[in-house]
């Protein structure tokens, strides 16, 4: 198992600071990192080396907590503790802040683009999730403020192909939202975690959602449509979400991030015990009660908490991670024989 994750490279991405989050562009050629130094750095390869292609330092007054690329790859959004979200436009190797989105009362914790590129979601310590509409002139308008959570909202993520939004919160729940009429509504609340839910990730099909928590577990939730063969009850025309698997006993501290590889289906976690773990669904396991095996466990992946793991969208097995130690590491994951 120790040979299944091999270090490719390590870079001091945000020296003397925490590196909070990573995001690959859609073509998998660039990686954005952000940190407590208020900067965003863009990484790319030259030969076999990862180098910093540009530094975005003018947008924010405080920590940059999350970054997200638009589906077209021409824009980068950044969420900051200064309560704003910046939209950066890519122009060859340069990035220009073209819009600053304001409205949240406190730190913005996460930002995510819908697969169409026409919608953006942000969430904040002010307990709200905002949905923004983007028009052809790159004007951003808030079309909905969702206040379903009772505490700090940590993360937002969109379904890979539908306009279905999910959020994770300090209130121990995951919530799902969809558009109804001309507004957005909460259509499901996923309860089961016993502490803060830090991150969530859809599987490649969008039928399952993984969530990770301060309770040291990963939960896998599955969507059931009305009239499903399994007899899972649904309310009206809304799908129902049910926890079908809990990964417990593997992590010794808070799990800060979970990433579901869109190419292979491998599930990676970032943990407060300085480790990275990878899980794979067992061949032939029951889709209604799947089982997962730990296929990689790198104990000292970083010298401090691991905050984020991100699979490259085009190159199977390429995984990036970042940590409170300020570093970004690039790993090659090799699927064990027999899977």
UniProtKB/Swiss-Prot annotation:
WD repeat start-end pairs: 14-53, 59-98, 103-142, 148-187, 192-231, 250-289, 301-339
Where in the cell is the protein located? Cytoplasm
Q: Where is this motif: LYR motif?
A: 176-178
Indicate yes or no for the key word Cytoplasm: yes
- Family under the similarity heading: Belongs to the WD repeat CIA1 family.
Which Gene Ontology molecular function entries are recorded, alphabetically? DNA-binding transcription factor activity
- CDD domains the UniProt entry points to: WD40
GO CC terms of this entry: cytoplasm; cytosolic [4Fe-4S] assembly targeting complex; MMXD complex
Can you name the source organism?
A: Mus musculus
Pfam families given in the database record: WD40 (PF00400)
Q: What is this organism's lineage?
A: Eukaryota, Metazoa, Chordata, Craniata, Vertebrata
Q: What is this protein called?
A: Probable cytosolic iron-sulfur protein assembly protein CIAO1
Q: Which UniProt keywords apply?
A: Chromosome partition, Cytoplasm, Repeat, WD repeat
The domain of life is: Eukaryota
Q: How does it assemble?
A: Component of the CIA complex. Interacts with CIAO2A and forms a complex with CIAO2B and MMS19; the interactions with CIAO2A and CIAO2B are mutually exclusive. Interacts with CHD1L, ERCC2, IREB2 and POLD1. Component of the MMXD complex, which includes CIAO1, ERCC2, CIAO2B, MMS19 and SLC25A5. Interacts with WT1. Interacts with CIAO3. Interacts (via LYR motif) with HSC20.
Q: What biological processes does GO assign it?
A: chromosome segregation; iron-sulfur cluster assembly; protein maturation; regulation of transcription by RNA polymerase II
What is the stated purpose of this protein?
Answer: Key component of the cytosolic iron-sulfur protein assembly (CIA) complex, a multiprotein complex that mediates the incorporation of iron-sulfur cluster into extramitochondrial Fe/S proteins. As a CIA complex component, interacts specifically with CIAO2A or CIAO2B and MMS19 to assist different branches of iron-sulfur protein assembly, depending of its interactors. The complex CIAO1:CIAO2B:MMS19 binds to and facilitates the assembly of most cytosolic-nuclear Fe/S proteins. CIAO1:CIAO2A specifically matures ACO1 and stabilizes IREB2.
